[in-house]
Curated annotation (Swiss-Prot):
PROSITE patterns: PBS_LINKER (PS51445). One of its GO terms (biological process) is photosynthesis. Part of a specialized phycobilisome (PBS), a structure that is usually composed of two distinct substructures: a core complex and a number of rods radiating from the core. This protein is part of a core-less PBS rod (called CpcL-PBS) with on average 5 stacked phycocyanin hexamers (PC, CpcA and CpcB). Linker CpcL connects the PC stack to the thylakoid, the hexamers are linked by 1 copy of CpcC1, 3 copies of CpcC2 and the stack is terminated by a single copy of CpcD. Ferredoxin--NADP reductase (petH) is also part of the complex. It comes from the Bacteria. The gene is cpcL. This is Photosystem I-associated linker protein CpcL. It comes from Synechocystis sp. (strain ATCC 27184 / PCC 6803 / Kazusa). It holds the Pfam family PBS_linker_poly. The chain crosses the membrane at residues 223-247. It is found in: Cellular thylakoid membrane. It is a single-pass membrane protein.
Amino acid sequence: MTLPLIAYAPVSQNQRVTNYEVSGDEHARIFTTEGTLSPSAMDNLIAAAYRQVFNEQQMIQSNRQIALESQFKNQQITVRDFIRGLALSDSFRRRNFEVNNNYRFVQMCIQRLLGRDVYSEEEKIAWSIVIATKGLPGFINELLNSQEYLENFGYDTVPYQRRRILPQRISGELPFARMPRYGADHREKLEAIGYFRNQAPLTYRWEWQKQPYPAGVYLAGKVVLYVGGALVSLGIIAVALSAWGIIGL
């Protein structure tokens, strides 16, 4: 037996403010299939859909749904169906649904599929009950079939963070992409089975910043650089003094 969605009250959010301004560089770029798209524009739309559903941190080859992309490029499915396919894929289930509790997963999906943050804990509980009674497919279908989704994105537009920037405010809301893929509870489980142990703090932030040689090699290089620079400087000074007749070479 499935339960109806529990009622919850909306709260004040940027996306509830009526939009009258002209879109600029600070506003979200809208990807839609309204009109004819070139092959490159179609690829950009597909990439935007992956980025919206999986987030930038999960833009990896193993998450690609080749068959779904083929259906979309051949106009067999709409943008909404493509988003639905990504959210119901095995990759999304394993990397997002199975590593989060229902409350956190609800927040992630509302951010990514409806383009806003959750209104309250009551909304988290309401949608968590949908997951418990209808499962992941039922929850995703409820979101994508909702009036809110259809009014804002319809069948042809990739979801995006709505009204992140308001011209009346100095700063906008933080992007939803900052939210990690899993929470502290799942990290504790990983630590319990041996992950993240005995790891020295990194001296670099990204892998491409990692020094390819040992520290001693760089120290020797610095010594050679400074000594060589000093010798070259002395040579230039000696040549100049010789040219002026002050010293003889």
